Amino acid sequence: LVGSEMCIRDSAYTATERKRVSFGKIPEAMELPNLISVQRESFERFKDEGLREAFKESSPIQSQNHVLEVTFGEHQFGDPAHTVEECREKDMTYQAPLLTDVRLTNKETGEIKEQLVFMGDFPMMTDQGTFIINGTERIVVSQLVRSPGVYYSSEMDSGKQIYKAQIIPSRGAWLEFEVDKRDQLMVSIDRKRKQSATMFLRALGIAVTNDDIIELLGNSDVIKRTLERDTALTREDALIEIYRRLRPGEPPTVDASRSLLEGLLFNPQRYDLARVGRYKVNKKLNLTTEEEVTVLTDEDIVATLRYLLSLAAGEQGFKVDDIDHFGNRRIRTVGELVANQFRIGMSRMERVVRERMSSQDIDEITPQSLINIRPIVASIKEFFGSSQLSQFMDQANPLTGLTHKRRLSALGPGGLAGHKSGSSRRTNVPTAVRDVHNSHYSRMCPIET
């Protein structure tokens, strides 16, 4: 009887009732912080804001003839079907159903159909900051990545110093400028072949004539040499030439090229500096662009080039950045990593929705019949099951579990993988990344991480 009574008392004793009692004579100087708040808060933020943003980015999905339009509204989570204990015992995933308001609008008739659509079961975080996937406890490790922004670097190439500028977005195409060994200003869009940066400026319509370019960037030797090599003299020539480099094999047209560049650099759905990126760009280049503008602007590009030219000319006050400094890095926590994966699933689902819009009978269509949740479910399952950052929780003792939840990793998608320069062989990580940097002091434990 005593045994069974103990059991009952145990199950009623929940994690929230635990009180920390100190038996020391000297009072504790500081209250112990919640050490797994990194994980918990991030996932809570994702459940609310992260999902809302992902749905907002995908709305509206339009049919090819622009008659039908699907938009996503508010979302909510149902209750998990099983408790954490049941999931552990029966090798199940601890998850809750995700439901979303979906509205289907027929623009011709003005008819609107609304439904609460089931978007699949979503793994939930336990109070301990872990996930239970098929009965095993897993942890999503936070990822250390380069912060979006603009970076300057230099390297030696056949005895000459080369200066580079990179505009790195949170999501989208990289833009790299460099003053090469022939002292010309070059640009590489989305890591494709290098081309003249003045041609790029013409194509964007920032500066079209040679005089415009000299007025914008000054009359240095670098600019003179670049203009001599630049074959395109009008905006149309420049657009066609750039399209040839970006999409070799396709017939180049001015309109196709213009929409390609617009889409790559100025479309918020495909290019996002994020607020941290906008802040870093403004700070580095002394700009005053609004924080809400998270795509590139003409000023960003011009200011980046001006700084690069001053740096290459060796002017005072212009210096290259240290990539390994923590000021140039940021942490992607669980919430952001899961949100990115959810976005991938959503974009795959969009294709299915468009196909179904064109194939189904317009009068019969309902939001439920259009939406196929398989891509989303598969994408989330893939992340928790096989991503480099979703790891089997270290359960040697309570402390190893805690340190595992607070660990940082530079690997994983969007982090470092197979680098060209000096790398430690086993994981292809550049040795410089593994070095202890003075900015780590009092921020990151060099041993546990």
List where the protein language model places each region.
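N-terminal non-catalytic structural scaffold regions of very large proteins
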Residues: 4, 9-425, 437, 449
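Membrane-bilayer interface helices and TM-boundary transition segments
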Residues: 426-448
